Design a protein with these regions (language model features):
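A contiguous strand-loop segment
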Residues: 1-73, 106, 284-285, 290
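Proteins synthesized as precursors that undergo proteolytic processing into mature forms
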Residues: 72-109, 202-211, 216
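C-terminus-biased signal that marks the final domain/tail of proteins
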Residues: 107-109, 116-117, 126, 149-306
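Catalytic cofactor-binding cores of redox enzymes
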Residues: 101-140
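Short helix/loop capping segments that flank catalytic or ligand/cofactor-binding pockets
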Residues: 59, 65-67, 131-134, 141-145, ...
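Structural recognition of the beta-strand scaffold that forms the well-ordered cores
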Residues: 55-58, 122-124, 132, 238
Length: 306
């Protein structure tokens, strides 16, 4: 991202009553599952894992188009879309079966810095099943399957797959595209994710995946005025869905830390917890002990709260 998105980590318990919008005609639900999430600007959920091992990650996609002319369906704010998935579903297939009904429309206000909220969502579960969800011309496009292991940014996913097929023919051991463009990073990640050790041992798997993520990250502080959609990587997360551990690494701190979901009380009585990241505090190892009682952040919707 082109600036610090002021991320913090929150723990949400089960039983929270939510609405997808702050006026009438909103999607409403009560969270079935607790989750550990990372925010963007503290106005929305952009990444996280729930207690069932479902992971959801929201990334920039400038080609996104959410609007349909004359659309009167109930409203889901893009700021809370990721949280809706984490709150309600245990598996990718379960989520896809509901989301493909397209029973709501996405409300996508501009972000605090004025950027458009053009985003797409990836979800994975502990079986390895994955879905990439993109709104194109007002309609939801879904790619579901274990073969979809990488998502970056532009272009739209079907175009990414076509570009990757071209590079598969060349072969990654001979040459890989090396720029910071998201399509090149997609190709490199697609090659390396199959080249690293394929093991259930988290002590090997987690650092192996992190090594791929570091390889395809955009260096901190890079500026490309002629390519405004290329921006620095701000942080990386890895979700160990088998052992229910959420790892987090900020480019501004020297340490990897994690939250072991098995040690967290997600019952409704436990309340909301927060791990502040914007105050310069450095964490290392299991940071469950550093969680503090907290109010929730306020999700951003198109209509300001009066």
């Amino acid at each position: 991202w082109k600036e610090d998105i002021m991320s913090n980590i929150y723990v949400f318990p089960r039983g929270i009553q939510r609405a997808g919008y702050n006026k009438e005609n909103a999607v409403k639900w009560t969270s079935k599952y607790g989750s550990v999430i990372a925010t963007g600007y503290d106005i929305g959920t952009c990444d996280g894992m729930n207690e069932k091992g479902l992971v959801a990650s929201l990334l920039f996609l400038p080609e996104s188009v959410f609007d349909r002319q004359g659309d009167t369906r109930p409203v889901m704010g893009i700021s809370i879309w990721t949280q809706y998935v984490l709150d309600n579903f245990a598996t990718v297939h379960e989520a896809v079966e509901e989301l493909k009904k397209e029973s709501f429309r996405i409300d996508a206000p501009h972000m605090p810095n004025g950027s458009a909220s053009t985003l797409h969502l990836a979800i994975t579960d502990e079986t390895g099943n994955t879905a990439v969800l993109e709104y194109l011309d007002g309609n939801l496009s879904i790619h579901e399957g274990k073969e979809f292991q990488v998502m970056t940014n532009s272009p739209r996913y079907d175009y990414q797959l076509a570009i990757n097929d071209y590079w598969k023919e060349i072969g990654g051991l001979q040459m890989l595209p090396g720029t910071n463009r998201s399509s090149d990073r997609f190709v490199r990640a697609s090659f390396y994710i199959h080249a690293i050790p394929q093991t259930p041992d988290a002590k090997i798997a987690v650092p192996s995946v992190l090594s791929v993520m570091r390889n395809v990250s955009v260096p901190f502080g890079i500026t490309t005025p002629d390519k405004p959609h290329i921006s620095s990587t701000r942080w990386r997360s890895v979700s160990d869905q088998k052992n229910k551990i959420y790892y987090f690494e900020s480019v501004m701190t020297p340490n990897l830390f994690w939250l072991d979901l098995k040690k967290i009380d997600f019952s409704p009585k436990a309340g909301i917890k927060k791990l502040p990241l914007t105050n310069g505090k450095i964490y290392a190892g299991d940071a469950v002990k550093d969680l503090k009682d907290s109010d929730s952040f306020v999700f951003l919707f198109q209509t300001p709260v009066m």
